[in-house]
Amino acid sequence: MNESNKNNIAGNEIIRGSVLPEWIDVNDHMNVAYYVLAFDMAVDSLWETFGITENHKNVSNSSTFAVESHITWQREMAVDEPYLITSQLLAYDEKRIHQFMRMYHAEKRYLAATAEWLNLHVDLSVRRVAPWPANILQRIATFADQQCDCEKPPEAGKRMTVSSPLYQARGL
């Protein structure tokens, strides 16, 4: 993992990959579902850094559940194009972690998509939120301390709106 503030890349690099042919949709670009898959693979990689592995699950009978996410699509990605995904922790506590990920074109360096996720640490025996084990909480703290000194991303916490709606549901 390295800090990636150079060349307009924000956050700590987590994974690299390339857009697979089966990820392409009828519009000849990466389908929305596969952006989520790529971000999920990045989360799995980050979790390994923290020690949240299959072994952790088996030994402690605990894991993480994603409880909220928000994806933004900025620019298209086409078949075989390389990407890199970075992570920036926005907040964490004894039971939760809130992170923001960015997908960049690995060569052209443009921002292709963002993902904001909230995860809970869960005791699988009772399926309830539970505190992080001390060793994992320490790894999360170390990552947070060593991450880029990035501002809160403009997409973080963003709500969806239509500026001049022809129709709007009551209460919006």
Could you say what each language-model-derived stretch is?
Residues 46-91, 95-97, 112:
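Hydrophobic beta-strand-centered segment that forms part of the acyl-chain substrate-binding groove
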Residues 113-115, 131:
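A structural microfeature
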